[in-house]
Amino acid sequence: MYIAILKCESMGRCKHNGEVSIFGVRPASFPNFPFHLMDKIGGFVILDELWLRRWCEIIEYPMRIPTLYVPIEDYGIPTVEDMDLIVDFIKYHVSKEKEVVVSCIGGHGRTGTVLAVWAGLNGIKNPIEYVRERYCECAVETEEQEEFVIEYLKMKKRG
């Protein structure tokens, strides 16, 4: 996992430091949180249980930034209900003209899945490609994650 991050960053392909914003959502990996952008941030979505304790000590309690914890197993997918919760959290903060940082440990699979869903909900026709081109070609790592993005967006289109 960390080898993939180093490989991507060293070759200039990934932007795990929060510099990319996809419709108000900034992806960041564990070691690269965009602390320099704190004035723009309205909330954080943390997709990994390992973050919980340390994150509370660093950001959530002292800085009072709303944080949504949705623990998803590494290389896994959220439930539909969890994705709905994530989307609602993002919509709320973006509607207040704030951005949301989404992060897991590596910043590829789980983070990429959320980014692709968000891009699709914002009208992008090929959201997985879009996220891979703008953020990281390693985003949305597994077939299961790709299928989740496609099926979730189909379900939301049907209403």
From Swiss-Prot:
Tree of life domain: Archaea
Instruction: Quote the Pfam families the UniProt record gives.
Output: Tc-R-P
Q: Which GO terms describe its cellular component?
A: cytoplasm
Alphabetized GO MF terms: protein tyrosine phosphatase activity
Sequence similarity = To M.jannaschii MJECL20.
- Kindly provide the name given to this protein in its UniProt entry: Uncharacterized protein MJ0215
Biological source species: Methanocaldococcus jannaschii (strain ATCC 43067 / DSM 2661 / JAL-1 / JCM 10045 / NBRC 100440)
